[in-house]
Amino acid sequence: MTLTDISQPAPEAATHTLARLGIPESYVDAHGNVQTPPVMTLAAVAEAVSSGPVVEHALVCAPGQPCADLVGDLTDLDGQPVPGPEGIGPAAGYYHLHTPEGGRRLVISAPERLPQPVRGWGWAVQLYAARSRSSWGIGDFADLATITRSAAEAGATSVLISPVHAAAPVPAQQSSPYSPASRQWLQLLHIAIADVPGADRVDLRDLERAGRGLNGERRIYRDTVWTLKRAALERIWAATRDDLPAEHDAWVAAQGRDLELFATWCVLAETYGTAVWREWPVQHQHPDGATEFAAQHADRVAFYAWAQWVADVQLGTACRAGATVVADIAVGFDSSSADAWTHQGGVCFDFEVGCPPDRHNLDGQKWGLPPLNPVALVAADFRPFITMVQSALRHAGALRIDHVMQLWRLFWVPQGAGAGQGAYVHYPTEAMLAILRLEAGRTGAWVVGEDMGTVAEGVRETMARYGMLGYRAALRLPVDQFPEAVMGASSTHDQATIAGTLTGSDMDDLRTVGKSANFEQLEGVRRELAEVAGVDPDGPIGAEEIHKAVLAQYRRLAACRARVVLASLDDAAAVAERPNMPGTVLQWPNWCLSLPRPVEDILAEPLARELAQVLGARD
């Protein structure tokens, strides 16, 4: 579809299907105004969604509770009969209901509420940015262990990290952790090479020197980091592959076909020099055509499976080291990703997910992530969603779901259209929420839904009913009005830091990159922050003034009702730059700036210690 197509009238037949397909003809934006998507957008979205198979929606029930629709023969997913009274929810789990009419439905039996966190505080950290002296140019899982251990010693209950989803093993390495190659597998850049089993059996001194040398500047060079770490992993693999521990063999076997496909995709990307799988030879553009290739490259496929095991072990160690790790789940995956390759039949590549203009982003956003077809997701028994959640909860004690509206609806923007020219598509909310309750209940994990921006009516009420915390971030006085059932923060990765706000450098950055913003309002926020901190907004702003402002802001957060409050390591380190500037590509070093000093130093500095005291005094 081209931009000129969007203004054309929609075929009448297409508009008739909108309600049935869960595509609203209008929506209420963040300012309370009713917006109507372009008619050609609605028609194109309807055509894409209706291309999926016709299936029955999943049936959600609760263990031991009456369920009138639970009539028929119940089996487990392997087809074995499940005994029990008809019309009563079975034990928590997934089942198939074979109805008297000959149909089959997925049954999700889940607890009625999610586990809950205690009142407390924690650190928010962009893991890639949290380098230590021993890092190889990027924060790693050993650094995460340092952070969680330090956090627990300081009295923190949690550590929220940026997504650690997998990236493609070829240049250019994707900078954004929110645009992954797979949400099921892990980012190999976060492997701490010194902690890899067998690292002591090979000489890595040359690679280590080069890796640590990357810590000399704040810019993170992922391609260079990957070149060095891949070389180190290859040396260790060559020395250990013939006598790998039984734990490795058991783990790889347990991951089964999913891991085999991901590792095969990695080798295909290496072989053809690109992760854009639609540019590969036709026979390899689909997993079914890659079986012979995988057999021919069995050692390399095994290498990538082993590397995932290494990453998984290290993440598990970090998650057990101290405070509860809150894993972050991205909205989707890159169109050239392993997940897109694996699940391509259910991916709508002619669209990208985004959000309409709101008070945080006046131009709206396009995230470059193709949406899953909700009809195809139901037909697949939600397997892509289930495996993603299970992977995230393998070690983490809590989840943050970025853009929690992904469980209700997503804003589909046609390729080539502006961010404001999209339309919403609804998803099977009750089933996806039940999956979350089931998987979180199995591990005792609590869940946070990032519900900022444009949020549909009734969403927050549903979150509260099931025990999902919301997310609030604000530098302004309304932090005092945060509700209790939320995770509260001063800002998100897309917003200004305290130092950037107080100095005014964030406004300068916005102007430099050409971003639309209400600069009068932003100046008001700056002056309000200065007043609360007892700082002259028109005087010189240096380290002392920033120190005062950081403590003043977090005193406000400490006193708010939010169940869990977060202090960012960016604020503890007085970082002025945003981690990410939405709507920019080359104009800003998105996701590429490390913290200005080693993370172990930042955690030991007076500001971090004082922040811990302020937040630790929460009643």
Q: What residue ranges belong to the model's regions?
A:
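Short, polar loop/linker segments at the starts of domains and inter-domain junctions
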Residues: 33-34, 134-142, 280-283, 503-507
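Beta-sheet entry/capping signal
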Residues: 94, 104-106, 120-122, 148-150, ...
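Extended acidic/polar, glycine-enriched regions
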Residues: 72-120, 130, 136-148, 153-154, ...
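A generic structural signal for well-ordered alpha-helical segments
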Residues: 18, 151, 318-322, 440, ...
